[in-house]
Amino acid sequence: MAVIVIADKNTGKTYKKEIDQNVIGLLTGRRIGDEIDGSFFEMPGYKLKITGGSANNGFPMKKDLPIAGKKRILITYTHGRKGKNGIRKRVTLRGNIVGSDISQLNMIITQYGPQPLEKPEEQKGEQ
C-alpha cells in the first residue's frame, strides 16, 4: 500500500490518499517534475505534478539525482540547512525516478477538475 499526498496551493490544504502498489507500477519511470493525469487516482479532470516522495525504507527522493535506486552522496550544508557553513556529510538518498519501492509520493495540483477534493460534510439534525 502506498500513499500520495496532494497539496492544494490555492487553499493551503493537503489531502492524503492510499493507493495500491499496482497504481505505483503504472507510474514507474516517471520523474520528479512530470505532470500526470488525475484519473490514476480517481480524480478526473485534475492534473498533478510530482514534487517528491520517499522509498519504503524512508530515504527521500532528490530532484537532481537521475537514478531509480539509492545512492550515498556527499552534500554540503549551506543556507537553509542546519550546521556550520562548509560542513559536508555523506547521506543516502533516492533518485528522482519513480520505482516500485516508493511508499509515498508528494504531488501538487496544477489543473483543477469539476469536482472538489474535499467532500462536503453532511448536515446532522439537532437531537
Swiss-Prot record:
Gene Ontology cellular component list: ribonucleoprotein complex; ribosome
One of the GO BP terms on file: translation
PANTHER family xrefs: 40S RIBOSOMAL PROTEIN S6
The entry's keywords: Ribonucleoprotein, Ribosomal protein
Residue stretches spanning the membrane: none
Protein source organism: Picrophilus torridus (strain ATCC 700027 / DSM 9790 / JCM 10055 / NBRC 100828 / KAW 2/3)
InterPro entries from the UniProt entry: Ribosomal_eS6 (IPR001377), Ribosomal_eS6_arc (IPR020924)
Molecular function in Gene Ontology: structural constituent of ribosome
Pfam families according to UniProt: Ribosomal_S6e
Official protein name in the record: Small ribosomal subunit protein eS6
NCBIfam families tied to this protein: PRK04290.1-3
Gene name tied to this protein: rps6e
Family according to the record: Belongs to the eukaryotic ribosomal protein eS6 family.
